[in-house]
C-alpha cells in the first residue's frame, strides 16, 4: 500500500494524453498505467496505421498533425511512434531540420508545438517496439535505407536534443523475435500480455519523472 501511494502521489488527479499509432490506439496499456499512477483522465489521440511523418495516403493521421490539436493543459504527454514510419519507408532526414516529410523533422515539429503551447507538461518519448510481421523485422532495410533500430535511435537522439526523457521499449521491453509470439497477436500488435509489459515499464518510468 505504501508503494502504491508513493507511485500515485506525483500523478494523482493529473491528466495524460497519449499519441501514437495502433499500439497506442488499442488502449491496452493506458488503463493499467492509469490505475497504478492515479491519473484522473487519459486522452487517447493515437491513430491506427499512421506514422509520425507527414505525406502519403496516411497524412490525415500523421502524428505530427494530430498532435497539433491535443488539449493545451495536459499534465503528461507521451508519444509512441516510429514503427509505421519504418513500414511506410519514411526518410529519417536530419536532426535540426524542420521538414515534416522526414521523421526527424515531423517529430521535432510536434515537440516544439507541444512545448510552446504547454511548457509545463511533462513530455516523454517512447521508442518503437521490435517487430516481426510481413517480412518487416529488425534486420529488414526499408526503401528509405533504414532499419527499425534507426528510428528508435532517432527518438533517443531527439530526446537528448530537447532534454526529454526517453522510454526505450526497443531495448528494454523484452519483445524480440523469440518472445513476440507470446506478447503479440501477429508479431506486431501487443496482446494483453504485451500491453501489460509496456505498462510494467511505463509505470516506474513515469513515476520517476
Predicted regions: what is each one?
Residues 1-19, 23-27, 31-40, 68-73, ...:
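N-terminal secretory targeting modules
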Residues 9-108:
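Conserved SGNH/GDSL esterase-like catalytic core that processes O-acyl groups on lipids
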Residues 19, 80, 125-126, 166:
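Generic enzyme active-site microenvironment
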Residues 41-43, 122, 163-165:
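Conserved beta-strand segments of alpha/beta enzyme cores
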Residues 44-46, 125, 168:
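Structural signal for conserved beta-strand scaffold positions within catalytic alpha/beta enzyme cores
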Residues 76, 121-123:
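Residue-level recognition of the N-termini of beta-strands and the immediately preceding loop/turn
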Residues 110-114:
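Hydrophobic positions in alpha-helices of CheY-like receiver
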Residues 128-209:
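Catalytic His-Asp segment of secreted/periplasmic serine-dependent ester chemistry enzymes
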Amino acid at each position: 500500500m505504501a508503494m502504491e501511494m508513493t507511485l500515485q502521489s506525483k500523478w494523482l488527479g493529473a491528466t495524460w494524453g497519449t499519441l501514437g499509432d495502433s499500439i497506442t490506439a488499442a488502449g491496452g496499456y493506458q488503463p493499467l498505467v492509469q490505475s497504478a499512477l492515479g491519473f484522473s483522465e487519459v486522452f487517447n489521440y493515437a491513430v491506427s496505421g499512421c506514422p509520425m511523418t507527414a505525406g502519403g495516403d496516411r497524412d490525415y493521421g500523421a502524428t505530427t498533425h494530430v498532435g497539433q490539436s491535443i488539449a493545451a493543459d495536459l499534465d503528461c504527454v507521451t508519444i509512441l511512434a516510429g514503427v509505421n514510419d519504418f513500414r511506410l519507408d519514411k526518410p529519417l532526414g536530419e536532426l535540426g531540420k524542420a521538414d515534416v516529410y522526414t521523421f526527424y523533422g515531423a517529430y521535432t515539429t510536434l515537440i516544439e508545438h507541444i512545448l510552446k503551447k504547454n511548457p509545463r507538461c511533462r513530455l516523454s518519448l517512447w521508442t518503437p517496439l521490435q517487430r516481426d510481421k510481413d517480412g518487416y523485422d529488425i534486420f529488414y532495410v526499408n526503401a528509405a535505407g533504414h532499419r527499425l533500430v534507426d528510428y528508435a535511435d532517432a527518438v533517443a537522439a531527439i530526446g537528448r536534443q530537447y532534454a526529454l526523457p526517453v522510454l526505450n521499449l526497443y531495448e528494454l521491453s523484452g519483445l524480440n523475435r523469440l518472445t513476440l509470439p507470446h506478447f503479440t497477436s501477429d508479431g506486431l500488435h501487443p496482446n494483453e500480455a504485451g500491453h501489460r509489459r509496456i505498462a510494467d515499464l511505463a509505470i516506474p518510468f513515469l513515476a520517476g519523472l
